[in-house]
């Protein structure tokens, strides 16, 4: 940068470095995706195209910085990227890492859109956008619990949404009636309602819907029980 009398303004910049010797998780999350998915008429309760687009965008981000990564996990409109404890990426600057991941993810989402929605044109007034945050976790136990939390959240949300929407689509309930029917129900109750009233066995739903998507250390997209295979996922890290 050229020297000038105005250069003093750089003194006001803050370079917030993330804590050293900690695992960094960057979570990218869709903003106003309820409106976005409604405008583009995403299928309910799950849109396979949309989920595969998220996976493709996440994999490209992962592969771009594979040497810094352990894995990435996504469901719905969010993705978590778990960086190695000793990463020196951008000198661990919070703003650099956060903005890089969210901009790279968004760019890939938009550029890959036509591969998954070939007959749907993105409208300039209805573009996808995401936010991101960086969180430091002190040890592997906490990181494993973080990933397990996201996995369990996926199961809870997907089971509810699956039953909620099929009661509307297949049984003709209104959204209010469906919500009321599910109020106070346990997981087993929801599965029974889905089977007895909608004729759908939740166990036969696609693994991607039930378990989310993991980009493993090899860059492969898999749909596994994260809680049961948590030690295997982090083996060597």
Curated annotation (Swiss-Prot):
One of its GO terms (biological process) is tRNA processing. One of its GO terms (molecular function) is tRNA guanylyltransferase activity. Keywords: GTP-binding, Magnesium, Metal-binding, Nucleotide-binding, Nucleotidyltransferase, Transferase, tRNA processing. GTP binds at residues 29-34, 76-77. Disulfide bonds: none annotated. InterPro entries: Thg1_C_dom, tRNAHis_GuaTrfase_cat, tRNAHis_GuaTrfase_Thg1, tRNAHis_GuaTrfase_Thg1_sf. Its EC number is 2.7.7.79. Mg(2+) 2 binds at residues 29, 77. It is an enzyme of class 2 (transferase). Adds a GMP to the 5'-end of tRNA(His) after transcription and RNase P cleavage. Belongs to the tRNA(His) guanylyltransferase family. This is tRNA(His) guanylyltransferase. It comes from Kluyveromyces lactis (strain ATCC 8585 / CBS 2359 / DSM 70799 / NBRC 1267 / NRRL Y-1140 / WM37) (Yeast). The gene is THG1.
């Amino acid at each position: 940068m050229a020297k000038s009398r105005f250069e003093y303004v750089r003194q006001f910049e803050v370079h917030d470095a993330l804590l050293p010797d900690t695992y960094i998780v960057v979570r990218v999350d869709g903003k106003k995706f309820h409106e976005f998915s409604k405008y583009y008429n995403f299928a309910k309760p799950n849109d396979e195209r949309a989920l595969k687009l998220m996976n493709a965008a996440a994999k490209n981000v992962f592969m771009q910085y594979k040497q810094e990564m352990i894995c990435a996990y996504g469901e719905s409109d969010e993705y978590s990227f778990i960086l190695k404890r000793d990463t020196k990426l951008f000198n661990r600057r919070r703003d650099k890492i956060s903005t890089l991941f969210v901009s790279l993810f968004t760019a890939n989402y938009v550029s890959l859109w036509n591969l998954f929605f070939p007959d749907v044109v993105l409208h300039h007034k209805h573009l996808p956008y995401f936010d991101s945050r960086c969180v430091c976790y002190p040890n592997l136990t906490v990181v494993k619990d973080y990933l397990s939390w996201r996995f369990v959240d996926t199961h809870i949300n997907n089971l509810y949404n699956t039953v909620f929407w099929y009661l509307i689509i297949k049984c003709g309930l209104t959204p209010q009636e469906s919500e009321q029917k599910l109020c106070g129900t346990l997981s087993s109750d929801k599965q029974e309602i889905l089977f007895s009233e909608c004729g759908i066995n939740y166990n036969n739903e696609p693994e991607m819907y039930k378990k989310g998507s993991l980009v493993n250390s090899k860059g492969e997209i898999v749909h596994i029980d994260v809680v049961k295979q948590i030690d295997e996922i982090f083996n060597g890290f």
